[in-house]
């Protein structure tokens, strides 16, 4: 009842009344009233009601206004943290200098208000959302706080008055329970509602949660109240279940309980009733494994999984069955117990249930600055952790959900203090590991590695969604995050049961994604599961490993390492048992995933390197080592197999795996530990055993025979060579790589850097990316740290970014210094680090180029040999590999085979063999003290060599070798020959003794048997015969005739060579000289000289080292070199061999020929490109100006680039010039000032477009059209400043009929990108330049020469009359029409048809609005104006391209593009269709040749435009175009002279307007005084005076803007300044006339200084006598009047005076025009990109008010536009395209704010131009991915501007695509 009465009162007074009641000491009635009111207002059954929110706001404010209340609360804000929360795509900052946690981030405001000068920071776009850490000393250093959070704000904030938040404490609990009840009510389990529309529920709650968010933003005081309510258990208890009588609340609570149940969770009470499984469970009792505990939802039943088709392309039987595990999970309660004790806990529960709605997440995070809340919330989060991950696994939106989860967890776990706290109190580590295990257990399958039938190991199935979609990453990322804290990692390493659990987790990945080699047909479905496998190993196994390793750096942590190593070995042993592994890997199986091996390897390495542990104490017994070595070795051999195309039937993905394995992000977690582990095994196992294992794994044992032929059971012959090369390269890497064997971190970084730079020049960012970094961000050597930069400057030179003429933009690159090539280039490291084999070649090519350039070596060099860092003492055993007999036998055999030219040997094989010998010489075994060979004969039947030292074995001679060969082999043939000749071996006793002693088994095959025997002795399985080692041979061998394979027979070969003698013979062979090494050579040799060179150098270096290190070797060498007899090749090679050799040689020669041809072709093409592509190199001298080709009177001949014929252009078969027509507004964007306009970057700055050339001319024309006759206006100005048509050519010509067939063929060719043939577009057939029309060349001579050029002696008046006659020649027309279309009289020829078609093209080039300026569009007047303006546009643009003047003279790039001569004739031919009626012919009014007809003005509705208002260059073009062509030069000069007088008079008028009244008076008097002097018509003083006196008659022309002029003329006008101004005023006209004369008559343009330009131009145009001294040139001296100058000026002024109805200021502005414009410029941009970005990326769109997704800026006018924005679309055209049409006549240059790149729109196409903002390393940062500070690159911006002005975008940028109006 009471509530009802309260509800009726107004809210304000109710709230005030209640607050007063509650403040009393006895507040019970107030409380009761409030509760009743709230029961009624916040009734959850009423749904979400805006009224309820309104009530809450009034109640909280307690009678004040809510906004007022907010302000008051905010004034008590004591928060010292920023805590601003943002969502995905927000722009934030990260400073590595200030960050303690790598996840630290700052909002833009805090970043900009802090001082981060010189720090290593970057801007980034948030992926998952985040929060600002400013003020949080746990996450970042205080020095980085902004000035707002640097002060400990809390200290000086007054304490909060009790009653301020009194109402909040009462009202908010009820408000929050309402939200919770609403969430309970709205939730339905997925089963019940098919579409389960949780979004709807959330939408209705939106205002409520937004209100909570608003409260959090009131600051610390309000957050404290909220925290109290959210965490108060008592309030929760009272409100959660509801009072007895509240049926709704009861029902509601039951819904909550059922939701808990359905989630597979049990509340603790129920659990207790079931017999307290709780915390009492011991580790062992956990028994059934995480899976079985998960109630109904979790058990992944078999039926479920077997329904899913088997998609991962593995050959399972039918479907793969998932496997259930019983691992001893730590604590079953982790996965299924939840008990909520406060609002916060239940709120989080619903947040999870509703899959993390953004608003809820933001609210929960906004509360974090409150410390109490932070701790409670973190505990709550951990308590719900298992539940979160279970929900994530079931979610359909797992991506979004993952991001939201990490958004929260990263805020909590980055804080070490907090992470440690929850690890200790809430078992965070146990929870995480258990949940990880539980997650992976849902997708386990039986492993098929090794023993497919009896394999007991289970692995994850990489085809499962969980792995494919990376669903596990939030969990793993949290795990890595907490392991980065030392205190947490230590707990983990100390907890042995946890470690064991972790090892079992890692073993799930051991052997995953197994590949089986396809032997028959190509695999049908190429599985892409390998992406998931590599990602999983890196993220779930390697990164936690790196995290743990960072905490095992010092001696004190030895025990951790020992423990991990022990558990690794135990788990590995279990794994070997589970997969049934004995001693041999199964054939044709390959997995790249051995995380257990890698954990073991990395902890070993760390223990030895950093903790001083003894390696042997960490190693298992020999048997285990032999097992451990097998799988990593298998991977190395398989890499070779993949590169030898043996896995080609498995598809491309297998190559993808091989590449990923060595790729920079993976290599130090994969191939590096593998190689290190093999190095450890090699250093501890018997070297003979190890070497023979390698050759057996690589399947090349059969090849290692001295026989010339052999059978290989496992390899095709074309696979033998790459596999042998692979095996040897692997051995070299194994023996020479020192990454884990003694190099310091700095040395490693340097070696990595050098190897990457040697492959290619690199940008800074790609180098950062390619250097394998320790994936844990807290590790020491991080790319980007100081050591990285120092190292980089030590090894590389910076090449600044350049713009290549071809238009491709280079970034700033780093290139190796010369001394790096000389001393540090390490081909072995390069081979290890190359993803693509071609990179090795690239490094070698660059090396060879360096040697040539520095003159060290000119031929093709071999990879240089590099001295190695000394081995760490623990790994000394590795050297024994190089000193074992097995390797020496292999080396001997291969040297022999190469010398004998056996098949499948190669330069690379020799190179690697020599490398191994040299490594052996450089790394002697320590205990081998005896220098000469020991006498002990080893008890070993493969005793080729007496001892193991390489040095002594080098000179050991081997006389005879026993080989097993097929009967057909040449060796058998030779033996038969010998027998036929009764040739027996010599039989003296001593000889036969050595014969017996030196008979060797050549096949290393016996070694394999030996290896097997040793292996089996160790494993105590001696009952197996060793004989099983001899493999059954395959029945078919490739190079034998079909049928039964020939029997193998044993033969004895006579060899009598030592390794030394073979090396000498190979030297002779390579140098093709018989005695290439003389005796004297040995004496003077110096190994240091032989660092760089080819095979000869390498052999010489080895021989020098051998003789330097052993006297015996030196003696043997002298003997060998002393026998300077020609080498006798051992017996003949069989004809079959010969044939194959010849074939190979022929092939080689053919290949070389082909290479040579290709190179020649390429160089020809290149030289052509250099001459032809004039656009690319503006300064080239090869002028292609067709007009200047012929200066003789003969006809011009043109070459057709299509048919190749040369001939004149004729009426019937015209030739045309390839041209590109494009509309252009470049001229219209010119301004008066030379300084470009600045791009606005604050709200105060603006750009005003009114002062541009285009705008000024528009205003001028519309002004004239208001007062004068339209047809006259249209001949008084030019248009085309905006949207004018510019014509340019590449200079190539073709027959027009050839062109048509060319276009036809293009039409049928669908592949052309970005070219629209329907629009007439094509590329020039010769130079491939873009074009869209053909301009016909008129037949006849190229230039008007001879008689046409003769200097004229006629008087001025005669010439004036002749010109008038020429104009009349075309016939007289009726008086009324001033311009009239004339009927074509001629029958059209092909030429005229083409000319008309080009005119049509020209008209179609620009938009209608740029053509119609007349009152009646489409009229002849309009057409006439458009046509002559095309000529004007092209002349003006050529002037702009020449730098705005003609001082540079000669041929410029612009001249080469210009086709004005041809264009002029086409326009003239078109204009011939019009004639100017003599009555209105301006010529008569210019020369007063007929008396003026003033009387006729009266019947005209409007006067004509006075001469003084007309644009003089326009008149020039009109006259020249309408007179018959070719025009004599004397007539041209006459027209120029007459027009110069007018231009000069206009200059005087314009000048006089700028004078003050006194100055006018003074000059008028001076002029009058001089008027009667002789030659007064050539003195500007008298003319100026006359002008002023005439114009003063007009009503107030001079008196309009007296204030402005007085301001203008504050400077005093001296005669010099007046002369200068007059010249400047006339210059634009003179330049244009001169340029036109140059194109019509071929006159040259001599260059000159700027100050001499006026005199030079007047001389060129024949205005001034050439004798005049250039210094004192007077502009008036060039005048030539055909009648009295004063009469003419009076006449012209009278036209202005007669204008009664034109307002005077208009007349003044038309008179005071200034024809000068500065060069066109793009906007001036700020130096720092951040200035643009900060202002524009948040700026809102003018049409919809929202922030655009892709904002862009027009760099021409500064307009802010939406790229692709639908808000600004008009008629299906997006804003950028629209703007490009409006602003640039279809050319637009836009800077994309969020990407820092520039796009160009040209017509219907667009292209990405690149960026003009580069970082400190000269690199672009497209899409701002790296977020480093960017600075304006002036050179690039200049190039962009040049391309815009020169209209060369189409030619220079190659990658164009259609935009379909969508930009």
From Swiss-Prot:
Keyword Metal-binding: yes
Superkingdom of source: Eukaryota
Annotated region (Disordered), positions in chain: 302-330, 970-995, 1128-1152
GO CC annotation: cytoplasm; ubiquitin ligase complex
InterPro entries referenced in this protein's UniProt entry, alphabetically: E3_ligase_UBR-like_C, UBR1-like, UBR1-like_winged-helix, Znf_RING, Znf_UBR
UniProt entry keywords in alphabetical sequence: Metal-binding, Transferase, Ubl conjugation pathway, Zinc, Zinc-finger
UniProt GO BP: eye morphogenesis; protein ubiquitination; ubiquitin-dependent protein catabolic process via the N-end rule pathway
Zinc fingers, UBR-type class: 80-151
Enzyme Commission number(s): 2.3.2.27
UniProt keyword Nucleotide-binding, yes or no: no
Functional pathway: Protein modification; protein ubiquitination
Gene deletion effect: Heterozygotes fail to form cohesive and stratified epithelium in their optic vesicles. Average somite angle is increased by 30% and the posterior central nervous system displays a gain of Rohon-Beard sensory neurons. Defects are the result of decreased Hh/shh-signaling demonstrated by the reduced expression of the Hh/shh target gene ptch2.
RING-type ZnF: 1270-1328
Biased composition (Basic and acidic residues): 971-984, 1134-1152
GO molecular function: ubiquitin protein ligase activity; zinc ion binding
Protein role: E3 ubiquitin-protein ligase which is a component of the N-end rule pathway. Recognizes and binds to proteins bearing specific N-terminal residues, leading to their ubiquitination and subsequent degradation. Positively regulates hedgehog/shh-signaling pathways that function in eye development, neuronal specification and somite development. Activation of shh up-regulates transcription of ubr3, which in turn promotes hedgehog/shh signaling possibly by controlling negative regulators such as Kif7.
Name of the protein in question: E3 ubiquitin-protein ligase ubr3
Organism: Danio rerio (Zebrafish)
């Amino acid at each position: 009842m009471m509530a009802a009465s309260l509800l009726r009162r107004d809210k304000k007074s109710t709230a005030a009344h209640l607050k007063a009641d509650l403040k009393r000491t006895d507040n019970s009635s107030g409380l009761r009233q409030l509760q009743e009111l709230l029961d009624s207002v916040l009734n959850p059954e009423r749904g979400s009601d805006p009224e309820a929110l309104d009530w809450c706001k009034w109640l909280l404010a307690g009678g004040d206004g809510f906004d007022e209340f907010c302000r008051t609360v905010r004034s008590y804000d004591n928060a010292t943290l920023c805590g601003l929360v943002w969502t995905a795509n927000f722009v934030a900052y990260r400073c590595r200098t200030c960050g303690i946690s790598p996840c630290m981030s700052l909002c833009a405001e805090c970043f900009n208000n802090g001082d981060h000068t010189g720090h290593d920071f970057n801007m980034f776009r948030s992926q998952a959302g985040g929060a600002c850490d400013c003020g949080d000393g746990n996450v970042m250093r205080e020095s980085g706080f902004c000035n707002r959070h640097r002060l400990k704000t809390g200290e000086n904030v007054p304490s909060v008055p009790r009653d301020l938040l009194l109402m909040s404490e009462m009202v908010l609990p009820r408000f929050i329970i309402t939200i919770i009840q609403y969430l309970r009510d709205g939730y339905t389990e997925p089963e019940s509602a098919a579409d389960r529309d949780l979004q709807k529920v959330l939408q209705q709650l939106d205002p409520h949660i937004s209100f909570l968010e608003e409260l959090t933003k009131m600051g610390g005081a309000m957050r404290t109240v909220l925290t109290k309510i959210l965490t108060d258990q008592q309030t929760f208890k009272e409100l959660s279940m509801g009072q007895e009588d509240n049926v709704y609340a009861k029902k509601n609570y039951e819904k909550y309980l059922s939701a808990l149940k359905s989630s597979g969770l049990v509340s603790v009470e129920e659990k207790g009733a079931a017999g307290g499984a709780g915390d009492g469970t011991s580790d062992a009792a956990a028994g059934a494994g995480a899976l079985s505990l998960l109630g109904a939802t979790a058990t992944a039943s078999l039926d479920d999984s077997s329904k899913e088709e088997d998609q991962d392309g593995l050959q399972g039987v039918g479907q793969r069955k998932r496997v259930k595990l019983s691992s001893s999970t730590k604590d079953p309660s982790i996965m299924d117990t939840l008990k909520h004790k406060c609002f916060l806990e239940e709120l989080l529960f619903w947040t999870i249930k509703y899959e993390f709605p953004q608003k809820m997440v933001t609210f929960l995070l906004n509360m974090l600055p409150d410390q109490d809340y932070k701790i409670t919330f973190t505990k709550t989060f951990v308590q719900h952790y298992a539940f979160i991950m279970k929900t994530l696994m079931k979610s359909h939106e797992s991506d979004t959900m993952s991001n939201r989860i990490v958004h929260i967890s990263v805020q909590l776990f980055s804080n070490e203090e907090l992470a440690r706290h929850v690890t200790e109190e809430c078992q965070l580590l146990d929870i995480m590991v258990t949940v990880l295990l539980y997650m992976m257990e849902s997708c386990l399958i039986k492993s098929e590695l090794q023993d497919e039938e009896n394999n007991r190991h289970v692995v994850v199935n990489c085809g499962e969604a969980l792995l494919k979609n990376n669903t596990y990453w939030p969990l793993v990322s949290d795990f890595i995050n907490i392991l980065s804290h030392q205190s947490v990692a230590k707990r983990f390493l100390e907890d042995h049961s946890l470690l064991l659990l972790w090892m079992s987790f890692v073993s799930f990945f051991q052997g995953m994604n197994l590949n089986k080699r396809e032997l028959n047909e190509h695999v049908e479905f190429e599985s892409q599961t390998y992406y998931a496998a590599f990602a999983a190993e890196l993220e779930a196994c390697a990164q936690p490993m790196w995290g743990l390793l960072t905490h095992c750096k010092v001696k004190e942590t030895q025990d951790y390492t020992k423990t991990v190593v022990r558990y690794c070995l135990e788990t590995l042993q279990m794994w070997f048992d589970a997969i049934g592994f004995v001693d041999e890997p199964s054939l044709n199986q390959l997995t790249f995933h051995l995380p257990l091996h890698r954990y073991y390897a990395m902890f070993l390495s760390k223990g030895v390197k950093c903790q001083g542990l003894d390696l042997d104490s960490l190693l298992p017994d020999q048997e285990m080592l032999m097992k451990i070595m097998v799988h990593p070795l298998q991977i190395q051999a398989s890499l070779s197999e993949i590169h030898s195309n043996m896995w080609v039937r498995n598809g491309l993905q297998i190559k993808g795996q091989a590449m990923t394995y060595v790729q920079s992000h993976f290599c130090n977690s994969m191939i590096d530990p593998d190689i290190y582990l093999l190095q450890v095994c090699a250093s501890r196992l018997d070297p003979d055993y190890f070497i023979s294992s390698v050759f057996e794994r690589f399947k090349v044992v059969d090849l290692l025979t001295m026989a010339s032929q052999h059978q290989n059971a496992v390899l095709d012959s074309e696979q033998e060579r790459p596999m042998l090369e692979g095996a040897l390269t692997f051995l070299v890497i194994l023996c020479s790589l020192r990454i884990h064997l003694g190099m310091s971190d700095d040395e490693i970084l340097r070696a990595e850097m050098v190897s990457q730079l040697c492959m290619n020049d690199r940008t800074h960012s790609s180098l950062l990316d390619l250097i394998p970094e320790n994936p844990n961000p807290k590790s020491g050597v991080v790319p980007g740290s100081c050591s990285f930069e120092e190292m980089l400057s030590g090894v590389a030179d910076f090449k600044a970014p350049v713009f290549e003429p071809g238009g491709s933009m280079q970034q700033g690159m780093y290139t190796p210094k010369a001394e790096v090539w000389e001393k540090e280039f390490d081909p072995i490291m390069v081979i290890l680090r190359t993803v693509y084999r071609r990179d090795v070649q690239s490094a070698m090519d660059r090396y060879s180029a360096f040697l040539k350039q520095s003159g060290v070596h000119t031929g093709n060099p071999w990879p240089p040999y590099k001295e190695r860092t000394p081995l760490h003492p623990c790994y000394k055993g590795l050297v024994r590999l190089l000193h074992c007999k097995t390797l020496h036998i292999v080396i001997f055999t291969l040297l022999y085979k190469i010398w004998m030219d056996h098949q499948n040997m190669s330069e690379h094989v020799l190179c690697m063999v020599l490398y191994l010998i040299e490594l052996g010489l450089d790394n002697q075994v320590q205990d081998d003290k005896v220098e000469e060979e020991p006498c002990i004969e080893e008890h070993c039947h493969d005793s080729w060599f007496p001892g193991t030292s390489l040095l002594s074995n080098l000179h050991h001679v081997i006389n005879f070798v026993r080989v097993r060969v097929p009967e057909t082999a040449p060796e058998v043939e030779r033996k038969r020959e010998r027998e036929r000749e009764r040739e027996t071996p010599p039989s003296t006793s001593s000889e036969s003794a050595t014969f017996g002693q030196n008979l060797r088994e050549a096949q290393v095959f016996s070694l394999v048997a030996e290896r097997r025997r040793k292996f089996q002795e160790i494993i105590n399985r001696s009952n197996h015969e060793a004989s099983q080692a001899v493999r059954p041979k395959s029945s078919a061998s490739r190079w034998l005739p079909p049928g039964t394979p020939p029997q193998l027979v044993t033969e004895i070969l006579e060899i009598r060579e030592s390794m030394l003698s073979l090396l000498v013979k190979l030297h002779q062979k390579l140098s093709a000289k018989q005695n290439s090494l003389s005796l004297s050579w040995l004496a003077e040799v110096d190994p240091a000289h032989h660092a760089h060179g080819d095979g000869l150098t390498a052999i010489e270096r080895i021989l020098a080292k051998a003789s330097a290190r052993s006297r015996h070797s030196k003696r043997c060498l002298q003997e060998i070199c002393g026998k300077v007899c020609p080498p006798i090749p051992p017996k003949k090679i069989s004809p079959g061999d010969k044939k194959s050799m010849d074939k190979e040689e022929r092939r080689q020669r053919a290949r070389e020929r082909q290479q040579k041809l290709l190179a020649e072709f390429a160089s020809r093409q290149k030289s052509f490109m250099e001459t032809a592509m004039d656009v690319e190199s503006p300064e080239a001298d090869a002028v292609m100006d067709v007009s200047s080709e012929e200066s003789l009177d003969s006809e011009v001949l043109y070459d057709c680039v299509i048919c190749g014929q040369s001939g004149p252009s004729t009426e019937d078969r015209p030739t045309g010039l390839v041209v590109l027509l494009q509309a252009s507004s470049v001229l219209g964007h010119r301004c008066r000032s030379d300084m470009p306009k600045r791009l606005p970057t604050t709200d105060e700055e603006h750009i005003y477009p009114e002062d541009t050339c285009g705008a000024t001319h528009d205003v001028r024309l519309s002004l004239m059209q208001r007062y004068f006759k339209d047809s006259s206006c249209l001949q008084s100005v030019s248009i085309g400043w905006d949207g004018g048509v510019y014509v340019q050519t590449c200079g190539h010509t073709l027959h027009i009929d050839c062109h048509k067939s060319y276009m036809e063929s293009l039409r049928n060719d669908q592949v052309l990108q970005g070219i629209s043939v329907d629009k007439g577009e094509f590329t020039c057939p010769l130079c491939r330049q873009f074009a869209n029309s053909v301009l016909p060349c008129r037949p006849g001579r190229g230039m008007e020469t001879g008689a046409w050029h003769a200097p004229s002696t006629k008087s001025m008046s005669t010439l004036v009359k002749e010109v008038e006659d020429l104009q009349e020649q075309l016939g007289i027309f009726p008086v009324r029409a001033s311009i009239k279309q004339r009927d074509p009289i001629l029958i059209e020829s092909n030429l005229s048809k083409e000319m008309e078609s080009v005119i049509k093209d020209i008209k179609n080039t620009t938009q209608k609005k740029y053509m119609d300026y007349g009152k009646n569009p489409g009229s002849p007047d309009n057409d006439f104006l458009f046509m002559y303006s095309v000529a004007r546009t092209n002349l003006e643009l050529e002037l702009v391209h020449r730098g705005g003047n003609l001082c540079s003279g000669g041929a410029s790039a612009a001249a080469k593009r210009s086709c004005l001569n041809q264009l002029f004739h086409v326009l003239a031919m078109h204009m011939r269709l019009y004639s100017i009626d003599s009555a209105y012919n301006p010529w008569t009014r210019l020369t007063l040749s007929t008396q003026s007809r003033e009387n006729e003005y009266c019947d005209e509705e409007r006067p004509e435009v006075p001469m003084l208002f007309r644009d003089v260059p326009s008149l020039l073009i009109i006259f020249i175009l309408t007179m018959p062509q070719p025009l004599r030069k004397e007539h041209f000069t006459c027209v120029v002279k007459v027009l110069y007088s007018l231009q000069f008079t206009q200059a005087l008028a314009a000048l006089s307007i700028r004078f003050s009244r006194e100055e006018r008076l003074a000059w008028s008097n001076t002029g009058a005084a001089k008027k009667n002097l002789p030659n007064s018509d050539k003195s500007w003083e008298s003319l100026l005076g006359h002008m002023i006196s005439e114009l003063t008659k007009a009503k107030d022309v001079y008196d309009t803007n007296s204030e402005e002029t007085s301001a203008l003329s504050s400077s005093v006008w001296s005669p010099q300044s007046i002369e200068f101004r007059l010249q400047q005023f006339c210059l634009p006209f003179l330049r244009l006339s001169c340029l036109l004369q140059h194109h019509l008559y071929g006159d040259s343009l001599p260059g000159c200084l700027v100050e001499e330009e006026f005199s030079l131009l007047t001389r060129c145009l024949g205005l001034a006598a050439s004798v005049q001294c250039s210094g004192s040139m007077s502009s008036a001296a060039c005048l030539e009047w055909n009648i009295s100058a004063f009469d003419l000026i009076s006449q012209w002024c009278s036209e202005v005076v007669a204008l009664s109805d034109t307002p005077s200021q208009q007349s003044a502005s038309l008179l005071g025009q200034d024809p000068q414009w500065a060069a066109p410029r793009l906007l001036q941009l700020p130096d720092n990109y951040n200035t643009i970005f900060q202002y524009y990326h948040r700026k809102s769109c003018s049409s919809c008010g929202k922030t655009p997704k892709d904002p862009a800026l027009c760099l021409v006018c500064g307009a802010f536009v939406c790229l692709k924005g639908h808000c600004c679309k008009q008629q299906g055209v997006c804003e950028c395209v629209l703007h490009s049409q409006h602003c640039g006549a279809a050319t637009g240059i836009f800077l994309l704010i969020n990407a820092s790149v520039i796009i160009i729109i040209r017509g219907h196409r667009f292209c990405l131009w690149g960026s003009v903002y580069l970082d400190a390393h000269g690199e672009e940062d497209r899409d701002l991915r790296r977020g480093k500070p960017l600075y304006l690159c002036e050179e690039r911006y200049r190039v962009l501007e040049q391309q815009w002005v020169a209209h060369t975008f189409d030619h220079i940028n190659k990658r164009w695509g259609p935009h379909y109006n969508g930009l």
